């Protein structure tokens, strides 16, 4: 649909990583990652990645930033640079203007994290699948959102596009609403209560009482935040330890 409209398809592949999905192989033009998350894997570095597939034609008349001379860079016309036009403009213009250059040490940390990407993601995915299946069996959990479950509307698509697994981020709803969500998170000891994802450690957050707490209940619902919504970013700890921690939280949350 993007190409029919004459615009590039840009995909944020942060959650899946290239190990699970390679968007360029499915027709995407540009892929972006927050390398802070699973690529680095340990929550120790801040960085981002832009991957230009080099297949989009910027000369369709809708992108003057690519087809007209850039007076700030000696009149360069980026579309004339061929396949890597987007990546080159990002390097010579956006990087210059925004200063978004990763530090050498952060680059080292991301590079080091990439060496274990496949091993980590395999463990993330296997743990997340077990957690999602566990949550579906709990009486005080009303629904679970995870594309690795047959009940998910995205299940078949996930099997086709991401046969190695559906990632490690899970959403679920506690029957007791906001108070149950607070009790659940506060009772956990293995999970870290933070807003991040993509760490080797298991992470949890209850959006209604944290990230979206300044919104009215109506505004929260408009943003897709229900009262008992909990988000898990499942880590690579032993699955028995993860499930034991979740059991304790669910027992404290009540019905």
Describe the role of every protein-language-model region.
Residues 18, 179, 241:
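Residues that form or flank phosphate/diphosphate-binding pockets in enzymes
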Residues 98-101, 105-107, 116, 121-123, ...:
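Conserved small-domain helix->loop->beta segment predominantly found in fold-type I
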Residues 1-137:
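Conserved PLP-enzyme active-site core in the AAT-like
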Residues 14-16, 149, 175, 235-237:
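Active-site beta-loop-alpha junctions enriched in small/polar residues
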Residues 51, 171-173, 233-235:
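Short hydrophobic/aromatic beta-strand micro-patches
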Residues 120, 186, 202-255:
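PLP-dependent enzyme catalytic core of the Aspartate aminotransferase-like
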Residues 43, 164-166, 225-228:
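Short glycine-enriched loop/turn motifs at secondary-structure junctions
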């Amino acid at each position: 649909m993007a190409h029919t409209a004459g615009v590039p398809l840009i995909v944020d592949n942060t959650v899946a990583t290239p190990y699970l999905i390679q968007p360029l192989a499915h027709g995407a033009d540009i892929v972006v990652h927050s390398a802070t998350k699973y690529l680095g894997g340990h929550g120790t570095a801040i960085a981002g990645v832009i991957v230009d597939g080099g297949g989009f034609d910027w000369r369709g008349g809708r992108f003057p930033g690519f087809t007209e001379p850039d007076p700030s860079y000696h009149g360069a016309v980026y579309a004339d640079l061929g396949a890597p036009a987007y990546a080159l403009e990002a390097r010579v213009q956006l990087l210059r203007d925004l200063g978004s250059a990763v530090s050498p040490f952060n680059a080292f940390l991301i590079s080091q994290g990439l060496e274990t990407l496949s091993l980590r993601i395999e463990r993330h995915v296997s743990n997340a699948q077990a957690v999602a299946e566990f949550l579906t069996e709990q009486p005080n959990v009303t629904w679970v959102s995870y594309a690795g479950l047959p009940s998910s509307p995205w299940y078949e698509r996930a099997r086709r596009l991401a046969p190695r697994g559906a990632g490690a981020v899970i959403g679920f709803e506690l029957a007791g609403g906001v108070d149950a969500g607070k009790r659940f998170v506060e009772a956990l000891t293995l999970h870290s209560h933070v807003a991040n994802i993509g760490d080797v450690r298991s992470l949890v957050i209850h959006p209604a009482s944290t990230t979206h707490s300044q919104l009215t209940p109506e505004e929260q619902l408009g943003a897709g935040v229900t009262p008992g919504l909990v988000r898990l970013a499942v880590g690579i700890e032993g699955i028995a330890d993860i499930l034991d921690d979740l059991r304790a939280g669910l027992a404290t949350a009540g019905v």
